[in-house]
Amino acid sequence: MNILMALSQLEVTGAEVYATTVGNQLTKRGHTVHYVSDTLTKPFIGQFFKLRFNKRSIPRRFWHVAYLVYLIKKHHIQLVHAHSRASSWSCHVACKITGTPMVTTVHGRQPVHRSRKAFHAMGDKALPVCEAIEQQLIEELDVPASQLTVSRNGIETQAFSPTEPPKNTKPIITIVGRLTGPKGELCFRLLDECLDLEQYDVRVLTGSAMEARFEQFANQASFPGYTNDVAQVLRQSDLVIGAGRVAMESLLCGRPTLAIGEAISIGVIDQNNLSHAMATNFGDIGPNILDIDFSSIAQEVEKGLSQPSCDPAVTEAIGNNYDLENIVSQVESVYQDVVISKLQKEMPILMYHRFIDNEAKKGTRGPYIDIKLFEKHLQLLKRLGFESLTFEDFANKGTIERLNPNKRYFMLTVDDGFVDNYELMLPLLKKYGFKAVVYVVTGETYNRWDVEASENPDKPFPLMSNEQIKAMAESGYIEIGGHTLTHPFLSTLSYKEQKHEIEQNKLELESITGKPLTSFAYPYGDLNENSKEIAQELKFDFAVATNSGPLALHQDLYQIRRIAIFPKTSALGLWRKVRGNYVFRKAK
């Protein structure tokens, strides 16, 4: 995707660290990420455009919106991700003008006034970084809960691993944070009222310029300035004082951590207060500024210094909840939610069954299509610039690959595994360069489920042999998927019976093809919760239904909706089905 990250800060902030960390990871995953901000200090990959969001006069705001519209159109931006109030306001208007999907990560409490309640200016989805912000948005700004998803700060956890505790002759206490605003007031009071600057080696790690009021501490505490090697500084510390990302990174390094932010003091982090710490972004979020009992801080400092390391269980919990890979995957999922919902378009997944080359092969039950008409389908798809994807592609690249701005994708699936798939379909796929996913029944040699049907029974049509299945899998054009042994209505079977049908089919196909299966198709599109549970248990990455499941395929990877193709689906009919909005129109 083409993504624009929007920030507004004049010094390094947690929002900037978040945006660049997530942005760089998105870039590594193949996305193109641009940045627009007043300043940008942290290392980033992509283009940076300077825009003074902090200049908020009416003419300036018009300029902000106009410039953002220009950037969106010039760089074919598919989604804007804002990270501050100033940037989100202008981005919201620009995205309204251009019809561009937008999300906003909310890093702190929002001001409450009438205009803010009426005009949230957060785009299509807001991502509060903790539960306290989510609660405030709902209760004080009337933001619908459905528009909110808690998305925590993503941290490159591998860069902050525990080491042996330092052996400092004089305990090192490191305070990390800005010297401006409430954080600056907090730091000043810690130095002035709470810390014994003679007894401890106090170091203030900040990206802010030194304010005059801090000069009185220059001979008793050190102000080394900002560093890109934060982990090394944390590991050298006997106690770290900070909030937000600082506290998380310190705990990942195994250091005793006093979580105190611009709202409240959590205390030295342990398993008892960890949940409260996470909910308040480690003290940064609360209804009041500096609602802190400073007289108790000295005791907390002593408590922290008495511990050589933090509880390993706390370090593990931080890793599980803030791991960058997991957070970015969640962000990608939100991007897909917003883009698909806003544009009302989804990649078409087509469902075929049999292919015929003469009238005698027509059936009475299972859908079929004349091979000449199928070729017209492929010709149309080629002419429209489509490329094919398989579920193996999704397993390797993620479902967000379907939103690649330079591609137009569809997926071709074929159920049951009839001989005509090998004899008639495969040559045409090779001719036009398309791939397909073929779901194969292995416990039958013909379509017995149709032949023995109580109503309108069909003629027998042969299924592929093991040799043909193997040849299909090795062709480079076919992904083989599971489709049970005997093509039953799964919802009518017990859990044990379902598992036997699905598992045995999977084992047989993997034995034939020599590689693990990625996806499974429920016969008739019939399933229940047991069916989905078994598909996951057997390590299928995806499972497809027919006309059930969410309209956006990524929202339930074990009940993916497909578009059925019938004998009379003409080229014009196919064009309507592959435009992208078919499932949305059909659902209305």
Where is each model-derived feature located?
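Short beta-strand->alpha-helix junction loop in the catalytic core
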Residues: 132-133, 151-160, 180, 209, ...
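Acidic anion/phosphate-binding donor-loop and adjacent secondary structure
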Residues: 138-139, 146-147, 154-170, 181-184
